[in-house]
Amino acid sequence: MLELSFFVAFKRFSLPFYSFKPLFMSSHEKNQTTRRGFLGSIATGAAAMSIATLSPLQQLHASPETPHIPNPDDPEKLFKELNGKHRIVFDVTEPAWLVPFAWPRVFLLTNMATGTPEKENNVVVVLRHGAIPWAFDDKTWDKYKFGEFFKVKNDKGETVTKNAYWKPAQPFTVPGFGAVPLGINELQDSGVKFVVCNAAMTVYSAVYAMQNNLKAEDVKKEWDAGVLPGVTVVPSGVWAVGRAQENKCAYCFAPMG
C-alpha cells in the first residue's frame, strides 16, 4: 500500500519534468537536469506518501493513550521464557502462502533429525505488516473480506476467503516431505509461538474504516476480538523481532509468496 502510493506519486510528479525539456540541451545539461529532477521527484513522492498515510499513522504517535493491546499478559513474558537449545524468529511481512508455516516446521523436523527434540527448540513467528490476516479467525476474515483487502492468494493464484492455516481440514502436502501438519494450531502444539503486530492492526483497521465510512475504533475493537487463540498481540512486529534477537533467536526473513 505504501509502496504503491510512493510509485504513483513518483510517476505523477516525474513525468512532466521530462516532457517539457528542450531537445537541444547538451549532454552535461541533460545529465544535471535529470539528476535534479530525479531527486526532486523522490522528495515530492516521499512528501505525497507522507500526506497519504499520515492520518492512520497519527493514531500511533499523536494519541494521548498507547494503542490498545488486548492481551492482558506482559508482552515481554513470551520472549523472556525462550530458553531452547536452538532458537529462531521468522519475520513474516506479507500474506505468503505456505512459507510462513512450512519453514517453522522444517526447522523443527531437521533439528529433530539431528538430535534435538521439539521441546528443546524455540520458534517465534512474527506476523506483521501485510501478514497480519493470518492471525485472525474466519469470522473476521469473512466480515472484513481480508482476502481482498490484504490481497491474499493461494498457490493457484486465487483470492483466499478464510484463514486456511487455522485448523485445516487436511494436512498440507510439501513436495519431498508429503503430508505435513502446517496449521497454526498444529504448530502451536509443537511449541511454536505466534505474535501479531498491534501497530499494523491499528493502521490497517483505520485504513479499512476510512475506505468504508466506519469508525476506526469500532473496526479495531472487532479485529482485537478476532485474534486467534494462543496468538500474542505485541506492540509492533519490529519490536517483537528485536526482542526475539535480544533473547538469542536467529533471524529468518520469510516473505516468499
Where does each model-flagged region fall?
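Solvent-exposed loop/turn segments at secondary-structure junctions
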Residues: 95-97, 129-134, 194, 199-204, ...
